[in-house]
Design a protein with these regions (language model features):
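Basic/aromatic-rich interaction segments and small domains that mediate binding to polyanionic partners
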Residues: 10-41
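Short coil-to-beta transition motif at edge beta-strands of beta-rich domains
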Residues: 1-11
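Intrinsically disordered, low-complexity, charged/polar segments
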Residues: 34-60
Length: 60
């Protein structure tokens, strides 16, 4: 699975939503949408503990 900046993921355990803020080499920085939580993880860990969710589309 290719992960890009702006992708959204949901934590499998808590259901909390995260957005991919930055990708540096193989490190992915996830930031929570509603709280100041931030994680720095590898792509394999993201796939293991998070489910991909739909990206919100802008409404014009």
């Amino acid at each position: 699975m290719a992960i890009a900046e702006g992708d959204r993921f949901k934590d499998k355990l808590t259901g909390q939503s995260f957005i991919v803020k930055k990708i540096m080499d193989r490190t992915i920085i996830l930031e929570a949408e509603d709280t100041p939580n931030r994680f720095c993880l590898s792509d394999g860990i993201v796939e293991l503990f998070f489910d991909r969710t739909e990206n919100k589309k802008s409404v014009n």
